[in-house]
Curated annotation (Swiss-Prot):
Compartments, record wording: Nucleus
The protein's role, per its UniProt record: The elongation of primed DNA templates by DNA polymerase delta and epsilon requires the action of the accessory proteins PCNA and activator 1. Subunit 3 binds ATP. Also involved in replication and DNA damage checkpoint controls, probably functioning as a checkpoint sensor.
Listed GO CC annotations: chromatin; Ctf18 RFC-like complex; cytosol; DNA replication factor C complex; Elg1 RFC-like complex; nucleus; Rad17 RFC-like complex
Binding site for ATP: 63-70
Family to which the UniProt record says this protein belongs: Belongs to the activator 1 small subunits family.
Subunit structure: Heteropentamer of subunits rfc1, rfc2, rfc3, rfc4 and rfc5 that forms a complex (RFC) with PCNA in the presence of ATP. Two other complexes exist where rfc1 can be replaced by either ctf18 or elg1 to form the ctf18-RFC or the elg1-RFC complexes respectively.
ATP-binding as UniProt keyword: yes
Organism of this sequence: Schizosaccharomyces pombe (strain 972 / ATCC 24843)
Keyword Transcription regulation: no
GO molecular function term, any single one: DNA binding
Entry keywords, A to Z: ATP-binding, DNA damage, DNA replication, Nucleotide-binding, Nucleus
InterPro entries found in the cross-reference section: AAA+_ATPase, ATPase_AAA_core, DNA_pol3_clamp-load_cplx_C, DNA_Rep/Repair_Clamp_Loader, P-loop_NTPase, Rep_factorC_C, RFC_lid
Protein name: Replication factor C subunit 3
GO terms for biological process, alphabetical: DNA repair; DNA strand elongation involved in mitotic DNA replication; DNA-templated DNA replication; mitotic DNA replication leading strand elongation; UV-damage excision repair
Length: 342
């Protein structure tokens, strides 16, 4: 994302005049050029060489959300096709049908034709392709093989293991890592200045912590808080996103380790309900806080194993009350076991 004045504007995507002020900041500050894309310098350099030598292959972009995969390929399309890049581009995402019928009809029809007076290939972007069925992926493989002269595919996914090996072998793969906090901070600073956000330095650092390398998440948090509060402090950030405050986690751990089971359960349940916290977020924060907890290594090992089991159960939709009880019990048991060893 751009950090220079005048760059990082909303891309010209046929929006009504004056609509830029209503755009989500994720779109408003999406990089228009490859030079504006944050981080991933090696990937950008390789893509620029492909484009300059007119040897663009089929590509597979994979990595966590909010790391610039879609922004990068759209910037590539602008560089290849110029301002009218939308005429040469087909983009399908999670809101579209990506079953076998979509591959046989939409994708095949687009890939099998060429633009009149156009000397270059067209491009198809399949975003969140890891949601495609195996049958659709097999059909896509045949389309990729048959129409390489007409079209280049860019397949984007979060989990590469959900993409069939046959498609992987036909694409040049690029892994997009989570963005470093310093890179996200540059863009966040630019947005804060451009949007005149009244935000405390500690609150900005909270945004960076909560984003965890996800630029989209950072900008969405910032925009939500800017809309809800005239002055953004740390509490505003955590209240707006419904994430446990670090002081809450410290309080939870002290209660678990010092109070009786029933008191600890009632204390955590009350705060959890009052602030609308999710047990999954509490579990993740307690996992992160265990590093600073002064308990024996064998107790940490036991607790971590139990937390992993609880998280696994939660993925199946188990009762949060039961799993909260299990979390409290596992931490208490781990601490007691360490005390007995001594």
């Amino acid at each position: 994302m751009s950090i220079e004045k005048g760059k990082g504007r909303a891309m010209d995507i046929d929006l009504p005049l004056g609509s830029e002020s209503t755009l989500p900041w994720v779109e408003k500050y999406r990089p228009a050029n490859l030079e504006d894309v944050v981080s991933h310098k090696d990937i950008i350099s390789t893509l620029e060489k492909f484009i300059s030598s007119n040897r663009v292959p089929h590509m597979l972009f994979y990595g966590p959300p909010g790391t610039g995969k879609t922004s990068t390929i759209l910037a590539c399309a602008r560089k290849i096709y110029g301002p009218n890049y939308r005429n040469q581009l087909m983009e399908l995402n999670a809101s579209d049908d990506r079953g076998i019928d979509a591959v046989r009809e939409q994708i095949k029809n687009f890939a099998s034709t060429r633009q009149i007076f156009a000397s270059t290939f067209k491009m198809i972007i399949l975003d969140e392709a890891d949601a495609m069925t195996l049958a659709a992926q097999n059909a896509l493989r045949r389309v990729i093989e048959k129409y390489t002269k007409n079209v280049r595919f860019c397949i984007i996914c979060n989990y590469i293991n959900k993409i069939s090996p046959a498609i992987q072998s036909r694409c040049t793969r690029f892994r997009f890592q989570p963005l470093p906090p310093k890179e996200i901070e540059k863009t966040v600073d630019h947005v804060i200045q451009s949007e005149h956000c009244n935000i405390d330095p500690d609150a900005k650092m909270a945004v960076l912590r909560l984003s965890k390398g996800d630029m989209r998440k950072a900008l969405n948090i910032l925009q939500a808080c800017h809309a809800a509060y005239d002055h953004i402090d740390v509490s505003a950030i955590y209240n707006c996103v419904g994430h446990p405050h670090p002081s809450d986690i410290d309080y939870f751990l002290k209660s678990i380790m010092n109070d009786e089971f029933v008191i600890a359960f009632n204390t955590i349940s009350s705060i959890k309900q009052q602030k609308g916290l999710a047990l999954q977020d509490i579990l993740t924060c307690i996992f992160e806080a265990l590093d600073e907890l002064e308990i024996k290594p064998n107790a940490k090992i036991f607790i971590l194993d139990q937390l992993a089991t609880i998280e696994h159960r939660m993925s199946f939709g188990c009762s949060e009350k039961i799993q909260l009880s299990a979390m409290i019990a596992s931490i208490k048991t781990g601490v007691d076991l360490a005390a007995k060893v001594n």
